Amino acid sequence: MHQPYSTVTPYITKDGSEIRELMHPSLHENRNQSLAEATIPVGTKTLLHKHMETEELYHVTRGVGRMTLGGNILEIVAGDTICIKPETPHCLENTGSEPLVILCCCSPAYSHEDTLLAR
């Protein structure tokens, strides 16, 4: 399978970030995971949320920010990788001067139905 980046249309997901689904079972022939690029604009943050089934791996490819991960606050920079276990509340804040860009690998694949916003 091959997915040219130029053909991926971004959308806004439930947490407020701009997402490009680079590989997802609903669009491609892969089965058990998804890979997306998330962009958080300067001065913004995503909504606190959790996934009941999905484990996520985030890899920061550009920018700097702050991540809430359960009860921890992490300062993140390009090159950092974070594991988010199921049922762990999390959100991202862009604290830098350029977009915060993250590769997100989800297993099982991301679904809106598995995303619960914090109250």
Residue ranges and their predicted role:
Residues 53-55, 60-65:
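Glycine- and acidic-residue-biased ligand/ion/polar-headgroup-sensing regions
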Residues 86-112:
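Ligand-binding loop in jelly-roll beta-barrel domains
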Residues 44, 53-54, 72, 88-89, ...:
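A generic "binding-loop/recognition-motif" signal
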Residues 1-33, 47, 114-119:
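A short, N-terminal "cap"/entry segment at the start of jelly-roll beta-barrel domains
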Residues 21, 36-52:
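Conserved short histidine dyad/triad with adjacent acidic residue
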Residues 71-86:
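Short acidic-glycine-tyrosine-enriched beta hairpin
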Residues 46-52, 93-95, 115:
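Short histidine-centered beta-strand/loop micro-motifs
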Residues 45-47, 66, 82, 86-92:
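Histidine-centered metal-chelating micro-motifs
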